[in-house]
């Protein structure tokens, strides 16, 4: 019940919202008792509020359960808000590896190879 969907145990997953489906995926991964949790763009198709809910669950898994959590994100504000360490790749090459508190807009511009836009932040178009 780490992701608060126990009451949905007997409901078809196809009837779930996108956020609930992500939580089911997280719960399924947790049932395997992993040492590392990999989440590839877990909030890509979610609204901003649900995105933060899912990211909070992933953060709790890391901080409360001690499971290393690696998350691939394209929303800069979520990376800064929920991450501890940021690894930036561009054209398959490492261009940033450091503490998220030390990352600057210039670092993000180097990662993306362009100026940062409002669409790089969740909830903005």
Regions found by a protein language model. Name each.
Residues 48-50:
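Helix N-cap at the start of a conserved alpha-helix in ABC-type nucleotide-binding domains
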Residues 73-74:
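H-loop/switch region of ABC-family ATPase nucleotide-binding domains
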């Amino acid at each position: 019940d780490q992701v608060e969907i126990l009451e949905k145990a007997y409901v078809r997953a196809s009837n779930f919202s996108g956020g609930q489906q992500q939580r089911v995926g997280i719960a399924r991964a947790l049932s395997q008792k992993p040492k590392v949790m990999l989440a590839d763009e877990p909030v890509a198709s979610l609204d901003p509020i649900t995105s933060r809910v899912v990211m909070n669950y992933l953060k709790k898994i890391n901080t409360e359960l001690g499971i290393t959590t690696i998350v691939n994100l394209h929303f800069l504000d979520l990376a800064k808000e929920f991450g501890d360490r940021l690894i930036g790749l561009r054209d398959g090459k490492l261009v940033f590896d450091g503490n998220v508190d030390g990352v600057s807009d210039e670092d993000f511009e180097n990662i993306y190879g362009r100026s940062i836009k409002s669409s790089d932040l969740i909830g903005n178009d």
